[in-house]
Amino acid sequence: MCGIIGYIGPRKASDVIVEGLKRLEYRGYDSAGIATCYEGKIFIKKGAGKIDELVKKLNFLELPGNIGIGHTRWATHGIPNDTNAHPHTDCTGKIVVVHNGIIENFQELKRELLKRGHVFRSDTDTEVIAHLIEENLRITGNFEDAFRMSLLRLRGSYALVVLFADDPERLYIARKDSPLIIGIGKGEMFMASDIPAFLAYTRRAVFLDDGEYGIVSKDWFTIKDIITGAVKTKEIHEIQWTLEMAEKGGYEHFMLKEIFEQPKAIKDAIYGNVKEAPKVAELLMKYDRIIITGMGTSYHAALVGKYLIQRFGKVPVIVEEASELRYEYEDILDNRSLLIAITQSGETADTVAAMKLAKSKGVEVVGIVNVVGSLATRIADETLYTHAGPEIGVAATKTYTTQLVVLTLLAKELGKLVGIDVSQIEGTIPRLPELVDSSLKINDKIREIAVKLNDKRDFFYIGRGINYPTALEGALKIKEIAYVHAEGLSAGELKHGPLALIEDGIPVVGIAPTGKTFEKMLSNIEEAKARGGFIISLGDDVRLHQVSDIFIRLPKVPEELAPITYIVPLQLLAYHLAVLKGHNPDRPRNLAKSVTVE
């Protein structure tokens, strides 16, 4: 949530910053701004609205200088308006700050600073940081000391980049519970909240850890511990993504591109975990209880993982949303449990907090993560990468299916260790890319279905067993990007209440592959049909055609693999509904790609 970009080097800073902010738009924002420094003077342009509009309206690109910072804001403290947009300055106008996160004690600090004569212009928590640094600079006379003293006073979460007019060849950065990355160029440096912001210039990156601050010039950087001031040694990561992977490549939207990238992403996930999955499976064998956690789509992947691991590993699995686990499981976590944490970005605030809690309780942690070098990968004892590549669309698509692939590989290896026959899924896994590709070939048919359903205001998705999470994920996609009410339900629950909501014309999407619950699903679909439901069924058995208004026939796969192939038409349905309604599926309202604040 929110985006940060900082630059120092030979280029015109405003050009680099505006380009970087555009590449961070997917994180969600309501206002934006940039600041540069030239000949000892700070120049600032900011306002509420979209970046392209602000560039024209406020002439962002006219700002001079080779050092600068930029920000896209998602309002937390203070309404989205020109004044509350970042960057923020102190009383002198010589200290300028951009910040992601929430300063929990900003009211206390603001009262203290008001008593000392500071004048505030905005309602944000961020402005407090600029004034606090100003106050400490008066005391110390030293930029680094003033910066670090201020950090020691802050409670909450932050990724910070600070520019001093009187120290115009260095940027000051810090991180606590919000991502910040240094991009290392040749005679230039970039700071950003996410990799795509600087991918056009460099693929060499350093990830700040929580509790670290740094000083960055165009040729060097130093990272230190906020508490002790000790210098930290940092690993430089070579990012495997290319700039082309983070662009639309001829597709109308990133989401559609990423849906169609799934065959390749799944292939990469399979072959990228050939060696790692067996090793992690052996680790899981040591434990008699496994907990899986995640948020949003990653939580739905966790639910699928529960079915897979219990079915093949014969070990009980608990699944809990990370936001609940960190508060409700504190007294349950112990070294007899293993935690699997699923997070696309590796920076999801609640998931990272749950991982930290587990580690503090002596729990071994396995991460299933897409972004190499992210915080989750540094907390986890073992990491399985999804190898999905950059996902720019806010609604998860290829990162979900690759998470499912990783969980399937892990469960398959567990099955081998406990003596379960896994030959059927083992033989089908290499065919998953072509099976998903066959689901993509019905894109035109799915669009026609979307046209028929475009006036519907309520949807119900139903599934049983391992297909229940697919119902949840399909409903989530409709909610996220088409802004239509949708519920994902366990089909067995229909008679326990939800059936009362089924009436003439309401779409009911039934996920019904051949498997041990198929006959029950067929009965549930017939029940919904008898109450007037408009039935859209997905399956491989022709009997579904007889009870459905629309039958989407998909290739027959082992039931354990159906969540991977069956979600694809539902992603396409949500996409086409969003486009038909005039919404941008890449940037749905009120949502952000990475939820890095709690």
UniProtKB/Swiss-Prot annotation:
Residues 2-219 form the Glutamine amidotransferase type-2 domain. InterPro entries: GATase_2_dom, GFAT, GFAT_N, GlmS/AgaS_SIS, GlmS/FrlB_SIS, Ntn_hydrolases_N, SIS_dom, SIS_dom_sf. Its EC number is 2.6.1.16. It holds the Pfam family GATase_6. One of its GO terms (cellular component) is cytoplasm. It is an enzyme of class 2 (transferase). GO terms for molecular function: carbohydrate derivative binding; glutamine-fructose-6-phosphate transaminase (isomerizing) activity. It catalyses: D-fructose 6-phosphate + L-glutamine = D-glucosamine 6-phosphate + L-glutamate. The keyword DNA damage does not apply. The keyword DNA damage does not apply. PROSITE patterns: GATASE_TYPE_2, SIS. It comes from the Archaea. Residues 280-420, 449-588 form the SIS domain. It is found in: Cytoplasm. One of its GO terms (biological process) is fructose 6-phosphate metabolic process. The active site is at 2 (nucleophile), 593 (for fru-6p isomerization activity). Catalyzes the first step in hexosamine metabolism, converting fructose-6P into glucosamine-6P using glutamine as a nitrogen source. Homodimer. This is Glutamine--fructose-6-phosphate aminotransferase [isomerizing]. The lineage of its organism: Archaea, Methanobacteriati, Methanobacteriota, Thermococci, Thermococcales. The gene is glmS.
